[in-house]
């Protein structure tokens, strides 16, 4: 059974690699809006949560260097799954195809079609969950992308704060409170808007706050303690709910608000 299963994984991996080969015929995912640059240097693949947000990102991006791949629907939790099983998921398969570097035994980072992979999800708890699912996949099945510093998280705003003629963008509640404390003077009224999702933003706003290399924030994903990271991913994303209970209870007092 083991050799047969291994053969199935290699066959599935080769199938994806052929579709994502950087030379010869290239069949890219239909939802991918690729960038125009032929040189990989400076290029970025943004994996965006949902078709609506993907549409805004496609309109607001720098077409020369930024590619957009919307991921509709629920992202697969790949923790504990074999690569063969993972490749049956269309969203994950499309991502591997777009990246071009293959997976498993056929993985080759030199064939990656972009300099950076950027995960872009809503700034709320749902968006954080989707980001966690994608990071789980990358950590388990494409870990070299993380080790080589090629994976980043975009930081879209959760709030827009208008104070007089000035506009500020806050990534979370703490950022909002900091801005109000530093910028609000006297009885000046603050007009605060909470975004429901990326799809609610106009393309120009998404560019100015999240896509523009001159004004955005990007967080590089790093693995500082391999053993501890492996334990946390297994406990939080694995099938055993009892493994998550101690983690949640240890941090219960840190939760001031629940975004439900």
PLM region spans:
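Charged C-terminal transducer/switch regions of large nucleotide-driven machines
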Residues: 11, 29, 133, 144, ...
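GHKL-family ATPase ATP-binding module
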Residues: 1-74, 107-109, 116, 218-260
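An acidic- and aromatic-residue-enriched active-site/binding cleft used to recognize and process polar
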Residues: 51, 73, 123-126, 156-158, ...
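N-terminal start-of-chain detector that recognizes signal peptides
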Residues: 15-21, 39-43, 88-92, 125, ...
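Conserved, well-structured core segments
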Residues: 44-49, 119, 196-199, 208
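Short hinge/gating elements
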Residues: 15-16, 31-34, 75-82, 116-124, ...
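N-terminal assembly/transducer modules of large multi-domain enzymes
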Residues: 1-7, 120-129
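Metal-dependent catalytic core segments for phosphate chemistry
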Residues: 41-111, 129-135, 139-153
């Amino acid at each position: 059974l083991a050799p047969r299963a291994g053969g199935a994984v290699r066959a599935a991996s080769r199938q994806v690699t052929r579709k994502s080969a950087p030379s010869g015929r290239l069949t890219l995912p239909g939802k991918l809006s690729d960038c125009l640059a032929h040189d990989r240097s400076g290029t970025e693949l943004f994996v965006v949560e949902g078709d609506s947000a993907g549409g805004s990102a496609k309109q607001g991006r720098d077409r020369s260097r930024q590619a957009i791949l919307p991921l509709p629907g629920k992202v697969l939790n790949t923790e504990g799954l074999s690569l063969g099983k993972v490749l049956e998921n269309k969203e994950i398969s499309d991502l591997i195809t777009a990246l071009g570097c293959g997976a498993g035994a056929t993985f080759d980072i030199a064939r990656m079609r972009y300099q950076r992979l950027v995960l872009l999800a809503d700034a709320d708890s749902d968006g954080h969950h989707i980001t966690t699912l994608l990071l789980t996949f990358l950590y388990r099945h494409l870990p070299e992308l993380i080790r080589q510093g090629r994976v980043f998280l975009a930081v879209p705003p959760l709030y827009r704060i208008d104070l007089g003629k000035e506009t500020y963008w806050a990534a979370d509640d703490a950022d909002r409170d900091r801005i109000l404390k530093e910028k609000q003077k006297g009885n000046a009224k603050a007009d605060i808007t909470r975004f429901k999702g990326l799809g609610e933003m106009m393309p120009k706003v998404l560019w100015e706050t999240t896509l523009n290399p001159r004004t955005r924030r990007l967080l590089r994903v790093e693995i500082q303690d391999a053993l501890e990271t492996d334990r946390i991913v297994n406990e939080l994303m694995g099938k055993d709910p009892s493994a998550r209970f101690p983690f949640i209870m240890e941090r219960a007092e840190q939760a001031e608000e629940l975004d439900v």
